Each structure stands twice: as structure tokens, then as C-alpha cells.
Amino acid sequence: AGIRQIRSGRARPGIKALIEVAGLDDLVLTTQQIAFNIAPRLNAAGRLDDMSLGVECLLAPVHSAVEQAQTLDALNQERRRIEKEMGQQALEWLPDLAAESVEDLFSVCLFDPRWHEGVIGVLAARVRAQCARPVFIFTEVDGALLKGSGRSIDGLHLRDLLVEVDRDCQGLLQKFGGHAMAAGVTIQKRDFEVFRDRLNEFAGVQLKGRSLDETVISDGLPLAFDLVTVAGLVRDHPWGQGFPAPVFDERLEVLEQKLLAGGHLRLKLLSPRFDQVLEGIFFNRDRMIESRSAHFVFKLDVNRFRGVDRPQLVITHCL
């Protein structure tokens, strides 16, 4: 009902202002655009400043909504800059980690005192995607304490893993909490190596002998790439948590590609099956596709640019 209200033009002023600063059209807004364009602007307030700024924007009257949305947009741009810088630093360390015995590396812990506390969770998710192992990213919160944010992989309950570490090494964890896929922990700075080693040890108990290669599940080949089919799939179905949008895969030819300022890759692709040129966006991809064709995994979306709707592939993997 909420997205129908937005599409009918009856959204609150703050929501309309957020849609405007994101460069979107409220009349054809999709759940994916809410997740990837609107929500990050709201979340940026809590990550870098005060989460109440997001609430105030949502409740804002007409006369102040645009200004508050612009404040959130500026915070989100700063968050993206910080995230990109931290990501480059963290990913530079991964080749060294990969050089260690793969058989003995079941988790990854990284620490840098310069990393922003509000962005370490996002960074943990990015590193996890690169190494296919549970990851904790730490930063310094004062002279003696480190705060860490973790992200896990399917089949390994991260909070339960911390419970085992805490039971084995009483006093190591100052505090911790979370759930299966994400957790937070505070430790003494002097205990970083001990935590790293114990986490790896207990993760190994559960993961030893199991393939750590990421499993990518697809619904198969799309029936078509035409606008009517894609728009019906995107706009007329209640995709969300517990009911995810379908994921497709297909080998496509790479015609053009361009790295965008935000650390994303925009592509022009050709489907030999339909002899159709397609637009694609690969979020958080900071390097080109090296081959002239590749096997892509993607979701379908509708991209509106200057009032014209076009089908778009939102790429998640290049195999």
C-alpha cells in the first residue's frame, strides 16, 4: 500500500524530496530504487551524524523537506567517499591473506584505526563478498578499545560463533551481540590478534572440509528483455524480505563499459539469443570486464532517464 501511495503522488513531502534528490520519478518508483537509492540516504544520517535527521526528513513539512533531503544527500555522498577509500585500503590486504594457506583461513579480521565507525559494517559486507568467509572489520573507538562489525556466510551463525569464543576465552569480548548473518563486538586493542586467531579456530570447526566458494542460485534464462515484460515483473509484484525478486543468468557480449564515479560499472551488452542491446549496471564493481563476453547473473529493472523507460540489468555476479 505504501508504494502505491507514493506512485499516486500522495507521499509525504520528505519522501517526495528524497525521491527528487535521488533523481527518480515517484510515479514509477520501484522497491529496488527504494532499497538502493532512498534507504542509503536515510541510513547515512545514522552512519555519519545523527539518525534523527532521517526521521525529521520523513516527517518534515513542505517548506523544509527539500533542504533536509539535500542534507541527507550530502551525508550520503560523504559516506560513499569514505566507503570507497576504506574499501580500497581493505581490499589491498586481501591478496596477502589469500597467499596464506587456504586450508587454514576460515575467517578474516582487519583493523585500521582510521576507519570510520559508521561504515565498518558496509565494509565488512564488501570484504565478505570478495573472500567468501566470515569477516570482522575493526576500528579504534578510544585509545584502548576496538569496535568490530561482522558479516557471515550462509550456514555459519555469527552470533553463536562469538558465544563459543566468549565461552572459551572469558573476558576477551568486552561486549557483543547480533544474529546469524551480522554481529558486533568490542575488544581490547591488545587482544586483536588473540580474537582473530580464536575466531578463525572456531570458524574452522564448522567450515573445515566445506567448500568456501560462493554458491550463486539463479532462476535461469529470462523469457524476454522487452519493456512490457520487465516492467510487469518489477512494478507489479511485492518483492522483498522473504520473497526476493527472481535472479537470472545468461552469457552476454560486452559492447561498451564505463567506470562511474561512485565505484560502479555501467555496461552496454548484447544478448545473442534475442539479438538485443541491453543496458546494465554493476554496483560496487571498480574494474572493467576483461573478456568480450561473460556469464552474468542479474536482476531485471526499469531505468527511467529523461522521461524514457528502458529495461536494465542489475548485475550481481560475473562468472
Residue ranges and their predicted role:
Residues A65-Q70, A74-L110, G143, L156, ...:
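Mid-to-C-terminal polyanion-binding domains and interfaces
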Residues A1-D191, P222-A224:
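Hydrophobic helix-and-loop "lid/oligomerization" segment in the mid-to-C-terminal part
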